[in-house]
Amino acid sequence: MTTGPATPPQTNHAEDRTEWPIQVLRAAPETYLLQEILKLAEVAIDTDGHPPFSDQTLIQLRSANAPLLILLSYVPAAPEVPAALAGVAVVLEHDGQPASGTLELVVHPTYRNQGVGQVLLKSLQSARGFESLNAWSHGSHAAAQQLADQFGFEAVRALRRLRLALDAGHQLPAASLPTNISLRSFVPDQDEAAWLAVNAAAFAHHPEQGETSLADLKSLMEEQWFDAAGFLLAVDETDQIMGFHWTKIHAAPAGHQAIGEVYVVGIAPAAQGKGLGKALTLAGIDYLQKKGLSSIMLYVDADNTAAVSLYQSLGFARWDADTMYSYPSATNSNNKFQ
């Protein structure tokens, strides 16, 4: 983090009389500014029912040497009035991949439909450009689609959010583990290295998950929601990890109930094709149900038909979706979805 006060926001004079001053940071924010960003995110969660930033982005916002570009839009105010955040855009640049980044953007509900998103994207275009940039729309808002169209981004990936209602009449089959496999919980300061190896192998073709580092893992373990007991490991007779189901419980935001999540399910390549994925999924759901939760959610790529079919067979139904947009120069046309 920077050691002194952040640079005062500069007004974007290209806009009309309703100007939204913009501040650009090329590093993780100072503590006070991080708290303001997180407060804005919480307000958005209360309104939208889902977070505007991924866990990875939240980790990087707290990391001193994170490869970040942050743009903050402020509410126009008199000089003596403390500036309030109207919106935030965060670009996480990917290590080892020049000019390759992932954008997430959120506008305070009070200031939506007033041009804040446009100002943030115009400022981002000036500060960085859109080359090799992917952008997530969490919840696939219509306003995000309009911004994507306006700035020339194209939809390239759909991530479905599914939900399972655990009412009294819904019975799930018991988890049936393969022979010589047993379940235990993750043990902090013991299982990190072994889990990272299995996670990397299980998600070798899924960089968002497979590139999780020890620092990333430790940051997640420091989150308030982390529960080692709900981090289930499938181990063989030598205690080697063959798979895992990391569960998560989202605290109840205003107007919403607490909800469990099938956070990550991963299977070591040597154990794939043996039914372990389904067994771990069921074991995690059972754990969450015993915590008193009545709803379970998960994310799954829309084109992962095998996983979608499995979850639907267990009673999961579509809730909403996230959409990834990409600037054309960074888009492989073969990956576009219709």
Curated annotation (Swiss-Prot):
N-acetyltransferase domain residues: 29-173, 181-338
Binding site for acetyl-CoA 2: 265-267, 272-278
Keyword hit for Repeat: yes
Catalytic activity: 1D-myo-inositol 2-(L-cysteinylamino)-2-deoxy-alpha-D-glucopyranoside + acetyl-CoA = mycothiol + CoA + H(+)
Name of this protein: Mycothiol acetyltransferase
Subunit details: Monomer.
Entry binding sites for 1D-myo-inositol 2-(L-cysteinylamino)-2-deoxy-alpha-D-glucopyranoside: 55, 208, 248, 261, 299
Gene: mshD
